[in-house]
Amino acid sequence: MRIDVISLFPEFIAQCAAFGVVGRAQERGLLELQGWNPREHAQGNYRRVDDRPFGGGPGMVMLIEPLRACLETVQAADTRPAPVIYLSPQGRPLTQALARELAQLPRMVLLCGRYEGVDERFLAQAVEMEISIGDYVLSGGELGAAVLVDVVARLQDGVLNDAESAAQDSFEGPQGLLDCPHYSHPATHAWGDVPDVLRSGNHAAIARWRRKQSLGRTWLRRPDLLDEAGLEKNDRRLLDEFRRELAPDDEK
């Protein structure tokens, strides 16, 4: 997959993507990441990329022409069709389901805004989709782009050492539940012991425990994700069991 990022700070994206899963994806040739600075396409001695908004008001607005020229160069560098995605608090919320859709694309172009945003005419003519990583405002779209690059990169075949890691993540699967708790060594610690079932070697019992914990954790922490009416009978039974086992003082 190829991801082109249009940003006034392309080095920021490159640094974020140099480590961990995204860095591994690039090393393995599974992800190509390229940054583009619209300032290089601006005119004049100062290479200005922003100006005051019509109608007055605070802040500056990113200009059409540097962005248009930059995008033209990006599209000429690789002729494969690619949606232009603007990182914006007004966009469609980024979910795991949307990430899976985007991960199937051969290429996409990410646009990072700054200041008060981007001239609306550029957005109307050049942008296919706006995506938000949350209901808050950042100084620019670079952090949002870094998040999107990471979530899409880890879904590429061959990036994770164990493909099951992605399949068992929170929000994965047809029902999009939260993940169950995980434990490692030591089995006994001053802060608690690993549940006996996870050390039993009984794979059926372990799978049942993990499913119950996943259902229960979703019910406790993200009830908006849990459509109880759509749960299978066995899942409803497990959730009821989880509720019965939950001590009153554990309910937060």
Curated annotation (Swiss-Prot):
It is found in: Cytoplasm. Pfam families: tRNA_m1G_MT. GO terms for molecular function: tRNA (guanine(37)-N1)-methyltransferase activity. Its EC number is 2.1.1.228. Gene3D superfamilies: 3.40.1280.10, tRNA(m1g37)methyltransferase, domain 2. It catalyses: guanosine(37) in tRNA + S-adenosyl-L-methionine = N(1)-methylguanosine(37) in tRNA + S-adenosyl-L-homocysteine + H(+). Transmembrane segments: none annotated. The keyword Cytoplasm applies. Specifically methylates guanosine-37 in various tRNAs. Homodimer. This is tRNA (guanine-N(1)-)-methyltransferase.
